[in-house]
Amino acid sequence: MELERYIPETLKKLYLYDDEHKGELITTLQVYLRNKQSIRKTADAMFVHYRTISYRLEKIKQISGINFDDANEVLAVSNGLIIYKMLKEIE
């Protein structure tokens, strides 16, 4: 589908990793962005220790190369998450 081209490659790598490893990195990323990139709020929302979130975020950066300091990249990833969810609902 044409919308798929708006999903950044960085995000596609993360989806693949999560599928292969039954991970929660995508969920962690969604909650982290929803909580304005606050590790503490993300940990509270997910009922895990903040160090768990820190570890997952490092893993996310390692796998995908996402730069959370780049506002344009964060916006592209946020939009990609929404588009991916929409495409899954259509299937």
Regions found by a protein language model. Give the residues of each.
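Cytosolic nucleotide-utilizing catalytic cores of signal-transduction proteins
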Residues: M1-E91
